Amino acid sequence: MVANSSYLDFTSYGTIPASVTDPATAYGLTNTQPVTGNAHITVAVVLNRANDPTALLNADWGTRQATLAQMQANGTLWTTYGADTGTFNTVKTQLGGIGTVLGDETGTGGYVTSAASRTIWVSLDAAGFQTLFGTPLMKGAAFGGAYEQLYWNGDLSLPASIASSTAGLWFDYGMDPATSALTSSTVALPQGAQSPGNQSTSATELYPQDIAALYNFPLSGPAHQTGTLALIEIGIGDALNPTIPGPSFQSRLQAYLATAGVPGSGAYYVQNSANERYNADNADERSLDVGVVSAIVPNSLIGLYVGSGDTVYTAYQTAIWDQQNNPAVISSSWSDGLSFAPGSPFATAYRELFVDAALRGISVFNDAFDGGSGNETGTGLTNLFTGSMSSYAMVVGGTSVSTLAAAQTDSTLAGVVLAAQQGDLATLWQMVRGGLTAWPVGAGQLEPFIETVWNQYVLSGSRLFPGYGENFATSGGVDTTQATPGYQTAFGLTPTDADPSHGVGRGAPDVSALSQGNMGYLLPGSNMLGVYPNGGTSAATPFWAALATEFNAIFKDQGLPNLGYSNDLYYIAAAIAPASFNDITAGNNVSTFIPGSTYTSPQLGGISATGLGYAAGQGYDLTTGLGSPNGLLLARALSSIAHAELYYDLTPVLENAGAPSSGASAGWSSTADQSLLFQSSLSHAGEWSLSLGSATYSFAGNAASPYAWTSALAQQSLQSDFSPTLVTLFDGYGQGQIVQTGVAAGTPLALSVSGTPATSHQAALTADYGFVDFVSGDGLSSVEVARPLAVATTANGANDADAVVRLRQNGVNDVSVMFYKVADYAGTVDGLAPGQAGYAEAAAAHAYSTISGQTTVSGSGYGAYSQTELAHVNAGDLIAMKLTSNGETYWAFASGNETVNGQHVAHLWSYGLNTWGWEDLYGGGDHDYNDLIVQLDFTSASGSHLLV
C-alpha cells in the first residue's frame, strides 16, 4: 500500500473530521459504482530524485546560485537532482504497458514527461487504474446528479517494481475538498465594516504603472528591457469570447496599453493553446494578470501557460520546464483548491514542483487568495490553499491603499484622518512606518495616506454583503501541513494558527500589495475589451512578479544572476533594511464560518461566524507578511545582499559557538579585536547588563522616547522625496543609553535586560552586516551590538569602485563628515588607535575623496537631503567616519571623543545596513542621534547606475 493515498488524503485533509474515511459519505455521493466503459483518468507518477537537493537549497543565496550555475554549465544539474535515467526508462515502459503515456520534455498536450522532471504522465481507463493501483476506479452522482465524480476507496497500491522508485502521485482531476463544520463555537459580529480602510465612497482607480509608482518601483518600465515572465492561466490562455467578433488578443492588448499611456509591444505567447477554452471567470482572471504585468514591464515577453486545462499543477509544470522561453519569474493567481494530506504522495508531488522551480532558477509568486482567514471554506476553522503555500514560493497577500481624499470619505478612517490633521505624533509615526513620505498633503494628491489589510466584508443587520463566500478579503494564516521555513525561523517567527489546536507551520503571506478596497487597478475586461476597475490578491501577485522582473533586470545590469528562489533574501532585507517594506498595522482578515442561521451571505446562504483569524500588527503578521514594497529601497537592499553573498566571506560582528537554538544571549563571542556599540532601547527605565568575559557591567538605562528614531525611519529619511517636515517633526526625541568599548577577539559576551537574559532571534540574518539585536523576553526592549564602521562590499568584488553617500540632516549646526580607511575593526590607522596622538593626521591621510574631489561632505541644512559618491573604494575596505560640527570634531570611535564623568562620549548610533546617525552636540546633547543620518551604498552605482 502507498501510505496516505486515500481519495480523502488527496482532496480533504483537515476539512472534514478524521473519522470520516468514506469518500461517498464525505461528498454526499449517490448511485456509486465502479467505472466501466471508456472513462479515463490521468495521473502523474513522480519518481525519486537521484539526490536530495535540500542542503543546497538551504544554503545561502550566493552559494545556491553559484552552485546551480556551475552544475548547469557542466551538465550535471539534472543527472544529480532529476530521476535516474535507467529507472525512468524502466518505469515509463512499465506504465506504457498499463495505459497511455502522455507528454514529453517539451510539455506536449500540457504534460511534461521527462527524467529531469522525474515525471511520467499516464492516461488510464478503468482496467488500467485497477491494474496500476490495485483498486477499482469508482464514480458517484454529486450535487443531486449535477455531475459525475470519480474517486477510489481506501489506499492505493503500486506494483513493487514501480513503488520502490515512486515518490509522489498527482491526478489531473480538479476537485474541491469535502467540508463539514469542525467547531460549534460561534461569535457575534460587529455591525458595519469588519475591518478599517476599505469603505471609501470615493475610491481611487489607477493604471498598474501608476500604482507601481506609488510603491516606488525602481524602473520605469518602457525605458528598460525586462525578462520573460510566466502567467499561470489554466484552460484560458488567450481565448476570447467566440460570440463577440473583434480584433485579435494581441491587438486588444496593444489597445489597452495605448489607453493606459504605456509604450510597448505587448509581446506574448501561449503554451498549449490547443487546451484553451473561453470561460468568462477564467478570462477575467487572465485579463487582470496580463493587464498588470504588461503595464508595469511592457518590454517583457509574457507567457500564458494553459497546462492540460484540468489542474493548475500542469500549468505550473509546463511553465517550470519550458526550456525554450525560460521564464525567470512565474506568477499564479490560481490554486488547486483541494487539501492534500501531509506525508501523502500528493503532497510530495505538488511540493516537489516548486523544488524544481528553485533548481531551475525561477522566482515563483503565488496569491494567498481572496477569502480571508476562512478561505471561503465552511469548517469554522482557518484555511489556506496548501498547494500554493510552498516554502519555495513567495506568497502574496492583499492590502487597501487610501489617499487622503479616499480616507476622508471612509467612515472607518475618520479618527485617523482627524488625528493626523491635528498633528498627533503617534498617528503620524505609525503612518510613516506604513510608507507615508509627505505631510501635510493636499486632498487631491495621489500620495498614499494609509495602507490597511484588504477586507471589504460588511455586516448590515443579519446580512453580510460582501460576504464570506466572495472574494473580498486577503487570505492568510498558517499552513500546518509543513514545517516553518528556515528563513522564517531565522527571522524570529513561530507562525501559529488561530485555531484551538494552535498548530505551527509555514506562515503566509510573505509579502503584500494593493488588492482593492479604497484603490483599484484599471484593467482590461474579461474579453480584453474596455477598461474596468479590478483587483484582489490576483492583482497583487502579478504586481509583485512584475517588481521581481525589474529586480532581475537590475541584477543583470550589475552582473548578477537572476534572483531565482530568493525568499531568504527578502527576509534578510526586512531585518537589515526594514525601510524596504511598508509596515501595515491596521485591519484583519477574519472570515471563518460554519453553516448556520445567524447571518446570510451571498454564495453561502445561512451561516454562523466563528471569529477566527488574524490581525495586522507591527512587523511580520499573518495578513500582510513583511509588508508592501518600497521598490527602490528593496532593490538596493537585495543588490547589496546579493553581491555580499556571492563575492565576500564576511566576518560576522559576533559568533555563537554554543547558544541554544532559541538565540539565547549566552554563547556569543566577539569575532575580532573590535570597537563595539552597545545601544539600549528600553520601553521603560531599568537596568541592563553586559558581560564581557568574566566581567559584568550594569547600567541604569533610561527609557527611549516612543519617537526615538528607528532603523526604518532613518533609512526612510534617506529618500530624496521624503518630506523635511516629517524629518524635523521627530527631532529631539532621545535614544536610550549607548556604551562603546573595545572587545578582544574571542571574548565571551552576554546581555540581560531587567535581570533576564536577552535573546537574538535574527542574528543569523544580521550579524554579517555588522549588528545583532538582543531582545527582552517581552519583546519591548532591546540592546543592539553594532560596529561603528562599514565593510565595503562593492559590486562583483571590484576595486576602484564608487560608493553612494546619502545624508539627511536633522540638526541645526553646520556639519560635515569625512570618510577614511581604517586597518581593522578597532579603527586603527597606521598603527595608531583612535584618541592617540597623530590619529587625526593619519586618518586625514587615508581619507576618501568624492567624485568631485572633496574629502569632506557637508550637510545641506536642517531637514534637507543630499547625496554624493566616494571614489576609489576597494573591495573589503573598512570605512570609518569623522564628524565636524560647529568646529568640534567627533569620531565614530568613542575613545577619540571628549570625556564626560570619566567616560568617553559615543556620538554614533547604528541604524541597520551601513546606516548611522550622529549626535552633533558636545557631551551627547539631546541623545537623539539623528542630527546627521549617513548611509554608504556600495552597489547601487554599479552597472548603469539604475539604483542611484
Regions found by a protein language model. Name each.
Residues 636-641, 935-942:
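Short beta-strand-to-coil "C-cap" segments at the C-terminal boundary of structured domains/repeats
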Residues 2-113, 121, 126-395, 451, ...:
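Substrate-binding/charge-relay-adjacent region of secreted/lumenal peptidase catalytic domains
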Residues 646-930, 937-947:
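Extracellular distal adhesion/interaction modules in secreted or cell-surface proteins
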Residues 545-553:
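Short glycine/serine- and small hydrophobic-enriched flexible loop segments
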Residues 552-618, 622:
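An often Trp-containing, charged/polar helix-loop segment at the C-terminal end
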Residues 210, 524-528, 606, 611-615, ...:
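Secreted peptidase-domain scaffold signal
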